[in-house]
């Protein structure tokens, strides 16, 4: 581990020199590449430097204790030594996490798809609740949300809603939201006060660059038709809605929220690229699944990941056994505690795997 950290520190110093070199600064593209590489390893190098400083302070304190000291001063040094050793352990644990391989998609924007599952209109209302929850969380994080396509219902829910979230590190925090979300509550239409259970499925796809997914135009069938609103009525007379079918995989994407056919086609292609990239990623992960099954979950769309119980004001994440009795706050976008716990568990699982392979 420390050989790797020494190499990273050397690389960091070299990059620091390069980004200050007038010759490099003159070549904008090259300079930006070095700045990005420098920023990527800055945190780990700073933590490593603090670790080395702490180790030196421990050695100094131990040397002092070998000398003849008056009792009060000896006690002070021993107390400081104890704190320094605790700090060393904390920094070492942090370095191990920082050395874990980064998910190449972590810094990407995402395309999220929420679909109402079992439960009819109640499931559609729950899909709407989830969309608002994620929108509010994105707002707290300073991210931007844009609806790509939606199929609203008369009561204000969604049969399906597809939207993008753009900002710093979106995928790294949203990737564990994929799966089946379950709601337990008394519907407003229920006169007997019985609790109903409904579900909605969430898919989180990292946005795919055009260069990452090659699509042969001959593999596409593109249909245009009139857009329809809630209840199925046609909302305009022009054929602005677009349906794209990717023939080799059978993936179908429909976009109708924009008035322009060109914009709907552009959005549909963006969703198609993300779905194709996600399909390739899922196939790759299925091959690795026998070697490693993460406790946080497989990201399998059919995996029930979380229950939202309204009568008890409770939300439970089944993957990590976390229960919070503040569902109202969670639905207002207060998701950090759940997301942080999922990230911590995933890191612990990956560390265990690294230690097991060591």
UniProtKB/Swiss-Prot annotation:
GO terms for molecular function: translation release factor activity, codon specific. Residues 286-309 are annotated as: Disordered. Methylated by PrmC. Methylation increases the termination efficiency of RF1. GO terms for cellular component: cytoplasm. Keywords: Cytoplasm, Methylation, Protein biosynthesis. The modification N5-methylglutamine is found at residue 233. It is found in: Cytoplasm. Peptide chain release factor 1 directs the termination of translation in response to the peptide chain termination codons UAG and UAA. Belongs to the prokaryotic/mitochondrial release factor family. This is Peptide chain release factor 1.
